[in-house]
Design a protein with these regions (language model features):
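Beta-strand signatures of extracellular beta-sandwich domains
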Residues: 100, 369-373
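Bacterial N-terminal signal peptides
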Residues: 7-16
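C-terminal tail/sorting-segment detector
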Residues: 386, 397, 401-427
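Surface-exposed, proline-anchored Ser/Thr-rich loop/turn motifs
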Residues: 335-362, 373-378, 405, 424-427
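Solvent-exposed, conformationally flexible loop/turn segments
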Residues: 353, 391-392
Length: 427
């Protein structure tokens, strides 16, 4: 009975607090945020890794998304390899909005094969979570319109000066780097296989490249004990504690990933933070070079060739928010739409003398923030911020220490919604 009464109370409290939030503002756009693929000579491809067949990935009529590429400086052969990778991705994700890529074939550092990444959007109508950055191509799909018509969704650069490219689509020689495979890797970053947590001067922060706030990818990141890296009670941001987590053991634990692996998957987290490499890739030990999921490890070896992304890569993009098509859909399946909003259950006493607690369950991935305010709306205490998933509740604890007798309100923002829970402190 207490649960039913509380849910009804939340509906009333939420209405009282949601007036300002209901006013729509223009979406924020930033970017691009790039991941860099370096030249690494110590990585060895598995035997036969260069011999994968790379035929037409699907019938053109069966493609799930239209991609439009603006090519700058490409030779005919390099452009053909790039376009083949684009065509593969067009068979694996579904969108009714055109995905636009700006691709440059240009001189880069001798130690760089290429880089790419998405422009980012947050707080647009139609996006599932508030204050979370989404890759522009996905944001367009979720919003049902092009949110930034004058800008590409993905920006990419590849090293035209590098002397050891394999630009054909046949078997990759053992002494060359396969351009098709490198482009396939970088487009995955552009579609959202990229995180927004980073280490700066030994301190972990929620943000990167002068951009603050979490990415959709970050909602699914946790430590070895299952604690979300966005949980500010465990990992304040900025903090050395968050930096230690990002450079030790990080796992991706989305619903789709658990479906295909029955467990979280390890992300690349070397002891020394590697900008553009750490955290935004699969672990290079857990996933063998030359395998389909090895595609999204942080390095590509000479002679390594991959025909398409693997099941884990597909699942990560599904958890970020993509609807899958073709071989990705066949591997991961369809994720049922997450509906039902937010449910809050009082798990501690109310009124209370020393402490009480709430259990928050969200039907969709998002950020949860809880603040305690007094009856005049003045902030009394920050109760924490964390990532919430359908299978990962948010426990809110309120301590009475330092509070006078009276009525207080837990102002709870989850995703794009906002609810309020009145609490009474008695002495």
């Amino acid at each position: 009975m207490r649960r039913a009464a509380l849910v009804a109370l939340l509906a009333l409290g939420g209405a009282a607090l949601s007036g300002a939030a209901a006013q729509t503002a223009p979406p924020e756009t930033r970017g691009p945020v790039r991941c860099v693929l370096p030249v690494v000579e110590t990585r060895a491809a598995a035997p036969g890794a260069g011999r994968r067949a790379r035929g037409a990935p699907c019938d053109p009529a069966e493609r799930g998304a239209a991609f439009e590429v603006t090519y700058m400086g490409f030779s005919a052969e390099a452009q053909a390899a790039f376009q083949a990778a684009v065509d593969t991705w067009s068979c694996l994700v579904r969108s009714d909005q055109t995905v636009r890529i700006a691709a440059e074939w240009t001189g880069l550092s001798a130690t760089t094969l290429g880089s790419a990444g998405p422009r980012l959007v947050r707080n647009a109508d139609g996006l599932p979570a508030r204050d979370v950055w989404y890759p522009a191509a996905l944001a367009d799909q979720l919003a049902g319109r092009d949110l930034e018509p004058k800008a590409p969704d993905v920006e990419a650069s590849f090293n035209s000066d590098f002397p050891a490219w394999h630009v054909g689509l046949g078997p990759t020689p053992p002494d060359q780097f396969d351009l098709y495979t490198v482009v396939l890797h970088e487009i995955a970053h552009g579609l959202g296989f990229v995180g927004g947590l980073s280490v700066e001067d030994g301190v972990g922060v929620v943000g990167r490249d002068d951009l603050r706030g979490p990415f959709a990818y970050d909602l699914h990141a946790e430590d070895a004990f299952g604690t979300p890296l966005l949980d500010t009670r465990a990992y304040p941001a900025p903090s050395a504690r968050l930096a230690a987590a990002l450079t030790s053991s990080v796992w991706f634990s989305g619903r789709a990933v658990r479906r295909v692996r029955n467990a979280p998957v390890a992300l690349y987290a070397p002891a020394r933070w590697l900008p553009g490499g750490s955290y935004s890739h699969l672990d290079d030990v857990a996933f063998e070079p030359g395998s389909r999921d090895g595609l999204m490890s942080p390095f590509v070896a000479r002679g390594e060739a991959v025909d398409r992304p693997g099941d884990v890569t597909c699942a990560v993009l599904a958890d970020v928010g993509w609807t899958l098509a073709g071989a990705c859909r066949a591997a991961v399946g369809d994720l049922a739409p997450e509906r039902g909003g937010v449910e809050v259950v009082q798990t501690g006493p109310n009124p209370f003398r020393s402490r009480t607690s709430l259990r928050v369950v969200s039907a969709a991935p998002g950020l949860a923030r809880a603040v305690l305010v007094d009856v005049r709306g003045r902030r009394v205490a920050d109760l924490g911020t964390t990532a919430v998933l359908p299978e990962r509740p948010f426990e809110v604890v309120v301590e009475a220490a330092g509070l006078a007798t009276g009525v207080y309100v837990v102002d709870l923002r989850v995703g794009a919604g906002r609810v309020a829970v009145p609490l009474t402190v008695v002495r």
